[in-house]
Regions:
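Leucine-biased recognition of intrinsically disordered, low-complexity hydrophobic segments
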Residues: 2-4
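Conserved, structured core segments of small domains
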Residues: 11-115
């Protein structure tokens, strides 16, 4: 399948499927250690490398911790909620019980000053 990041389309096998933007909120899982900063949680390097890969793939548009770091918010481009859940389930922190999907909402990004 050929992904066309930023163009809202994905082409594969002669079919075209529309891509959409979503606001994805990730929350701490049951194995999160509240006594340790985010970068000192077990598996930080593996998690960070995984997330960097999602950015490089064009899946994550932007994201990071919000407020006190209890949650993260990401703008993602995907075909739908199933794709989002499937891809995020591959995060080493998901399988380790450190992070889980809190919510997924379709998001119309009308303003984008990144150029």
């Amino acid at each position: 399948m050929l992904d066309l990041p930023g163009r809202g389309m994905s082409v594969g096998g002669g079919t075209v499927r529309a891509m959409a933007n979503f606001a994805v909120r990730l929350v701490h899982g049951p194995n999160w250690d509240p006594g340790r900063p985010i970068r000192e949680q077990d598996g930080w390097k593996e998690h960070a490398a995984f997330m960097d890969g999602l950015v490089e793939d064009g899946f994550i548009i932007l994201g990071g911790p919000v407020d006190d770091g209890e949650q993260t918010l990401h703008a993602v481009e995907a075909a739908g909620e199933d794709e989002i859940r499937t891809r995020l389930a591959l995060d080493p922190w998901a399988s380790a019980g450190l992070l889980r999907v809190g919510s997924i909402e379709r998001w119309a990004l009308w303003l984008d000053g990144r150029g």
